A protein has these predicted regions:
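Short glycine-rich anion-binding loops that position phosphate/pyrophosphate groups of nucleotides
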Residues: 42-45, 95-96, 120
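Phosphate-binding glycine-rich loop
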Residues: 64, 69-112, 130
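PLP-dependent aminotransferase-like
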Residues: 105-136
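N-terminal "arm"/small-domain region of PLP-dependent enzymes with the aminotransferase-like
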Residues: 2-65
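Conserved beta-strand segments of alpha/beta enzyme cores
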Residues: 11, 35, 88, 133-135
Length: 136
């Protein structure tokens, strides 16, 4: 009988599982302290700005619509600011998606990827996923 590992890319087996940072409450309990500010997960200790809250309120009635994944309106607005056409821009759902997209497009097996340490884990992840060799 075949195992699922026999059907996937062999590089998948080299990937480490993501280990998220501990929640603030757990760190406070573990060390017996209060007032911890967590920066590792890009959490803002001040919360969202009032302008963001207002924007979310304004957008709330249309959240049932699937967003334009091509970001047509955004591209049209920012292209003139840079003197470029809209097709020069690519947007993604955060750095993870963009780094992965670049890696999937340009990395080949055995390419060497040089990165600084410590670094964002996605560089190592996509390098291994594509069979490239991450080098710190």
């Amino acid at each position: 009988m075949s195992k699922i590992e026999d059907f996937g890319r062999p590089e998948i087996l080299t990937l480490d599982s993501y280990v998220p940072g501990k929640p603030i409450e757990e760190v406070e309990r573990e060390f017996g302290i209060t007032g911890v500010i967590k920066l590792a997960s890009n959490e803002n200790p001040l919360g969202p700005s009032p302008a963001v809250i207002e924007s979310l309120k304004e957008a709330a009635p249309s959240v049932f619509n699937y967003p334009d994944s091509n970001c047509f309106k955004l591209k049209k607005e920012i292209a003139p600011l840079f003197g470029l056409s809209a097709d020069h821009f690519v947007f993604g759902n955060g750095a993870d998606e963009l780094i992965k997209m670049i890696g999937e497009t340009f990395l080949n097996p055995n390419d060497e990827i040089i990165y600084g340490w410590p670094t964002f884990s996605e560089y190592i992840f996509v390098s291994k996923l594509m069979g490239a060799k991450p080098c710190a």
